[in-house]
Design a protein with these regions (language model features):
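Extended catalytic-interface subdomain
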Residues: 2-29, 41-55
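"A position-specific structural signal for the A-helix of alpha-solenoid helical repeats
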Residues: 4, 46, 76, 80, ...
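Residue at a conserved register position within TPR or TPR-like alpha-solenoid repeats
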Residues: 8-9, 51, 85, 136, ...
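Solenoid-like repeat scaffolds
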Residues: 26-35, 63-72, 100-111, 116-121, ...
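Start-of-helix signal in alpha-solenoid helical-repeat scaffolds, especially tetratricopeptide repeats
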Residues: 41, 73-75, 82, 119-126, ...
Length: 198
C-alpha cells in the first residue's frame, strides 16, 4: 500500500521516499474519481504535505493550484504556501494565504467529504492554526505561536483513529519546538514525552 509507505517514510524522515510515494498516491486518483467519491480528494494533497514536512519550499512555490472545485485541496495548497512564505521571511504573503485556508470550510464539496466520514473541517482548522503559528514563530512571537499550536493539538486529539492518521504528523512536535524556542523547557519535555506515548 503506497499510502502506508508514504506515511511511514514521512514519519522516519526519509524525504525522497516520502515525496516519491506521495506523488504516486496522488497520481492514482483522478479528478473523476474524486467527484464520484469525495473523500479521495485527500490523496491529491499529500505531495504538498511532504514538501512542507521536508521544507521543500521551491516545490511548494512551483506547485500548480488545484481546480477550484476541489475545496479541500485548495485549503491545503493555501496552508503550504503560507508556511513556505513564512519560512522565507515573506510574512505579508504568508498572512494572505493563511487567511484563505478556511474560505471554503462550509462549501458543498467539503460537507460532502464530511458526510463520507472524513474529518475535513478539523484538518482545515489544524492547517489554519499551524500556518498562523508558523507566521508567529518566524516573527519571534512565541507565546502567540504556542497558543495556536496548542489549539491544533487539541483538535488533532479529537480526530477519529485510523491508520495512517488523518493528519500527516503529530502536531505536538511543532508545539514542543515552539516551547523550546520560548525557553519553556519543562513544558516542552512533557509535550515530547506525551507525543512518544501516543
Amino acid at each position: 500500500n503506497v499510502h502506508f509507505l508514504w506515511a511511514a517514510s514521512t514519519m522516519e524522515g526519509m524525504s525522497d521516499l516520502s515525496i516519491e510515494s506521495a506523488i504516486k498516491v496522488s497520481n492514482y486518483v483522478s479528478p473523476e474519481q474524486i467527484r464520484n467519491i469525495p473523500f479521495l480528494e485527500f490523496f491529491h494533497t499529500i505531495p504538498l504535505l511532504s514538501y512542507v514536512r521536508f521544507a521543500k519550499w521551491d516545490k511548494v512555490f512551483s506547485y500548480e493550484r488545484p481546480d477550484d472545485d476541489f475545496k479541500f485541496s485548495n485549503s491545503i495548497f493555501n496552508y503550504a504556501l503560507s508556511v513556505a512564505h513564512a519560512a522565507n521571511g515573506n510574512l505579508l504573503e504568508a498572512n494572505r494565504f493563511q487567511s484563505m485556508i478556511l474560505n471554503d470550510i462550509e462549501s458543498e464539496e467539503v460537507n460532502a467529504m464530511v458526510m463520507a466520514g472524513h474529518p475535513t473541517k478539523s484538518l482545515m482548522k489544524i492547517a489554519s492554526l499551524l500556518a498562523s503559528g508558523s507566521i508567529d514563530m518566524y516573527s519571534s512571537k512565541y507565546s502567540e505561536a504556542i497558543a495556536s499550536f496548542k489549539e491544533a493539538v487539541t483538535i488533532q486529539d479529537t480526530l477519529p483513529y485510523t491508520e495512517p492518521p488523518f493528519w500527516y504528523y503529530p502536531t505536538r512536535q511543532t508545539l514542543g519546538h515552539a516551547l523550546l524556542m520560548n525557553k519553556s523547557f519543562e513544558e516542552a519535555a512533557l509535550v515530547f514525552e506525551r507525543d512518544l506515548k501516543d
